[in-house]
Design a protein with these regions (language model features):
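Flexible beta-alpha connector loops of hexameric P-loop NTPases
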Residues: 41-49, 91-101, 160-164
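Conserved motor-coupling elements within RecA-like helicase/translocase cores
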Residues: 30-67, 75-79
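Short, high-confidence coil segments that cap the C-terminus of an alpha-helix
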Residues: 12-13, 37, 64, 117
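SF2 helicase catalytic motif II
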Residues: 59-65, 71-120
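A short beta-strand-to-loop transition that corresponds to the Sensor-1 phosphate-sensing loop
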Residues: 19-22, 69-72, 88-89, 122-126, ...
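Conserved RecA-like ASCE P-loop NTPase motor core of nucleic-acid helicases/translocases
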Residues: 13-21, 41-43
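Conserved interdomain linker/interface between the two RecA-like ATPase lobes of SF2 helicase motors
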Residues: 1-4, 110-167
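Walker A/P-loop NTP-binding motif
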Residues: 1-13, 33
């Protein structure tokens, strides 16, 4: 993630990184600042209105290169977006259950098309919708190699006595 953000920023473009939860936004924003990114701003709904307004204005004026936030960060007036990275794309927090109904993944895709930005959907276990969509549309799916030492055994739970503990 950090390497991709550096490449995008070096090109003079900006990055939006979405995470499903507020604590993840704060932690990732701090991590990016520690790793040398000084024009990083964190944006989410739990900020006070005064802080949120100040950050919105800094973003609008182009003072910020990287925005880390929850799904509301997609609607910020950040210009020249070169990267939209959706971390844990399978998380249900990206889907809004209230009017207006929207899914952060779809908004990210549409904004990425409008901005001609790279859109990355990151997940350790992708949602079936995205996995199927990428396979049908012949998009690039990067899969991590299976780590040695991990052993998987498929167990038919119907064959085990009731109360058996499986770990």
């Amino acid at each position: 993630l950090i390497q991709v953000v550096e490449i995008i920023c070096h090109q003079g473009r900006r990055a939006v990184i979405l995470v499903p939860e507020v604590y993840q936004a704060e932690a990732l924003g701090e991590h990016l600042r520690i790793s040398g990114k000084d024009r990083v701003e964190v944006y989410h709904g739990h900020l006070s209105s005064m802080v949120r307004s100040a950050r919105w204005e800094r973003i609008r004026q182009g003072e910020v290169q990287v925005v880390v936030g929850t799904r509301s960060a997609l609607f910020l007036p950040i210009s020249n977006v070169g990267l939209i990275w959706i971390n844990h794309e399978d998380d249900p927090s990206y889907k809004d259950e209230h009017l207006p109904y929207y899914h952060g993944r779809e908004v990210a895709r549409m904004r990425g098309e409008c901005e001609q930005a790279l859109v990355v959907y990151g997940s350790t276990c992708p949602s079936l919708e995205m996995y199927g969509k990428f396979r049908r549309q012949v998009r690039k799916v990067l899969e991590r190699p299976w780590h040695e030492g991990h052993q998987v055994e498929i167990i038919n739970l119907r064959s085990l006595p009731y109360g058996t503990i499986v770990s």
